[in-house]
Amino acid sequence: MDVRQSIHSAHAKTLDTQGLRNEFLVEEVFVADEYTMVYSHIDRIIVGGIMPITKTVSVGGEVGKQLGVSYFLERRELGVINIGGAGTITVDGQCYEIGHRDALYVGKGAKEVVFASIDTATPAKFYYNCAPAHTTYPTKKVTPDEVSPVTLGDNLTSNRRTINKYFVPDVLETCQLSMGLTELAPGNLWNTMPCHTHERRMEVYFYFNMDDDACVFHMMGQPQETRHIVMHNEQAVISPSWSIHSGVGTKAYTFIWGMVGENQVFDDMDHVAVKDLR
């Protein structure tokens, strides 16, 4: 488990390129036949990836010991979105088939969660966010047909994109975790511009569906102290509440966003005008 401490905005603005990457970038999300796990002190979110190829991968008691509990989800909820080939997730003996861009919410209290791929030639890639939970909501599969899509932006401003809301109150109940998938239209490069912060929630972006020769310049920092981190395919970045979170790519891309914090009101954000950015 890779533990990342919280960081003050006044400290963050003094960091050089490598310093910013060390604090906020999750460089390797998927490792064959293993799970990766980054634990952030910011709202206690855990992010990572699971890519089973030649064997199943389970997340259970061994992680619980690192969290000071008996098992991983004793006091947590889990959200998973599969960006790879078809797979299965077995939760306490109940098997769910999770296809490409299907998702599974796992409620607090699940003791054993086992991940597998259907075809080793096209393995599943399970990206997950995990957050503290105060009660148990039912484990539920969510398919792309069940999400709440919203299309925003314009080709003229190169920010035409569709936001697919997987884990939001209109789709299913969670304690605090919200997740979704945003896909840019072909030829569009910007996400979340004009940008915003949200004092009451933190967020993690996971960029994927990118060519090897492409990258995204992820914008972060306070609106008057902006910085950037260069992101490549299948990498994640942590965004504290005080930071903007926006990006521009060399080509179109897709990203998964996950939020935890005070509320689940998607539009509860503090907008920043482009003219006010520095």
UniProtKB/Swiss-Prot annotation:
Molecular function in Gene Ontology: 4-deoxy-L-threo-5-hexosulose-uronate ketol-isomerase activity; zinc ion binding
Annotated PANTHER family: 4-DEOXY-L-THREO-5-HEXOSULOSE-URONATE KETOL-ISOMERASE
GO BP annotation list: D-galacturonate catabolic process; D-glucuronate catabolic process; pectin catabolic process
Enzyme class: isomerase
SUPFAM superfamilies: RmlC-like cupins
Gene giving rise to this polypeptide: kduI
Residue numbers binding Zn(2+): 196, 198, 203, 245
InterPro entries xrefs: KduI (IPR007045), KduI/IolB_isomerase (IPR021120), KduI_N (IPR027449), RmlC-like_jellyroll (IPR014710), RmlC_Cupin_sf (IPR011051)
Listed name of the protein: 4-deoxy-L-threo-5-hexosulose-uronate ketol-isomerase
CDD domains linked: cupin_KduI_C, cupin_KduI_N
Keyword Metal-binding belongs to the record: yes
The protein's annotated pathway: Glycan metabolism; pectin degradation; 2-dehydro-3-deoxy-D-gluconate from pectin: step 4/5
Family of this protein: Belongs to the KduI family.
Functional summary from the UniProt entry: Catalyzes the isomerization of 5-dehydro-4-deoxy-D-glucuronate to 3-deoxy-D-glycero-2,5-hexodiulosonate.
Keywords: Isomerase, Metal-binding, Zinc
Source superkingdom: Bacteria
EC code(s) of this entry: 5.3.1.17
Quaternary structure and interacting proteins, as annotated: Homohexamer.
Pfam families assigned to the protein according to its UniProt record, in alphabetical order: KduI
Recorded catalytic activity of this chain's protein: 5-dehydro-4-deoxy-D-glucuronate = 3-deoxy-D-glycero-2,5-hexodiulosonate
